[in-house]
Amino acid sequence: MQVTFLGTSSGVPTLNRNVSAMVLKPPQRSELWLFDCGEGTQHQFIRSNLKLSQIKKIFITHMHGDHIYGLPGLLASIGLAGSSSGIELYGPAPLKNFIDSCLYNSSSRLAYSLKFHRVENAANNKEILFEDSELEVKTAPLKHRIPSFAYRVNQKTRPGRFDIEKAKLKGIPPGPVYADLQRGEEVRLEDGRIFSGKEFCGPPRPGVSMVYCTDTVYTESAIEISRKADLLIHESTYSYKETEMAYERGHSTATMAAQIAAKANVDQLILTHLSPRYTPGNQTCPNDLLNEAKAIFPNTQLAKDFLQIDLNKS
């Protein structure tokens, strides 16, 4: 599982940080999942090694402009390229009307399908939002000025590593039967012998998990959805010096993000959604927010545009 940051500023873009967008590349798949789509996101795709044509799912946290203004243009560009078979969009209830209105009023026609999924019920009832044989996505309500939602992607436990040499020593011929054994299934060979895949596989391999949590002030819901995640990506709009402003505007300080990471017992925290006021050279700079968080949760990193993180378990 690979994460790429395309926008790490809050509110407005800066010279070095675009507004919110993050891409997840699911393991063993030639597809991309986009989380939020602030203005200029498609430009960030061009500057990266990612392809718009590979986007299959888009997850929107909330309907503030710095998280959605890039979406109509991005969808239209994908349509012009003619390389998409369809995209599924997950987000708050107003998302569909926003996209439909933009496309209608700009006379844009997409040559592919859009399927919208409202997330409120899954978030409030703690239901799984999406699931297939390898991955599941959960969502949870956050605490912001408008409805906002966190997303968690879990890779399911995988079969243990298949010992090819052991299978060969048992006289099992290579072929499709190896795939059956790797899945732990019982197989019968043409000579009548029966083997269980458990004989040739190591212990099951746990999957990795990622949580994307923005925009929100400190809330227990963020802790709950983040528990024992391998990676928590959490907004860090303000320094602790602006705690009062953070509560007024429904945002987190670096301290709040670190407290959530610590209480949720995550492996790694990455701070994103930084206020433009914290640019290098100002009285408070991004590294000050990083140090603020690391004082509480040492395994913290500062997001920057085009940073890539690979999540793997041995």
From Swiss-Prot:
Cofactor dependence: Zn(2+)
Superkingdom per UniProt: Bacteria
Residues where Zn(2+) 1 binds: 62, 64, 144, 215
A GO term for molecular function: 3'-tRNA processing endoribonuclease activity
Entry keyword Protein transport: no
Function: Zinc phosphodiesterase, which displays some tRNA 3'-processing endonuclease activity. Probably involved in tRNA maturation, by removing a 3'-trailer from precursor tRNA.
Protein name from the UniProt record: Ribonuclease Z
Keyword field: Endonuclease, Hydrolase, Metal-binding, Nuclease, tRNA processing, Zinc
HAMAP family the record matches: RNase_Z_BN
Note describing how the cofactor binds: Binds 2 Zn(2+) ions.
Family membership noted in the UniProt record: Belongs to the RNase Z family.
EC number: 3.1.26.11
Record-linked Pfam families: Lactamase_B, Lactamase_B_2
CDD domains from the UniProt entry: RNaseZ_ZiPD-like_MBL-fold
NCBIfam families: PRK00055.1-3, RNase_Z
Catalyzed reactions: Endonucleolytic cleavage of RNA, removing extra 3' nucleotides from tRNA precursor, generating 3' termini of tRNAs. A 3'-hydroxy group is left at the tRNA terminus and a 5'-phosphoryl group is left at the trailer molecule
Active site: 66
Residues given in the record as Zn(2+) 2 binding sites: 66-67, 215, 273
Record's keyword annotation contains Membrane: no
Subunit structure: Homodimer.
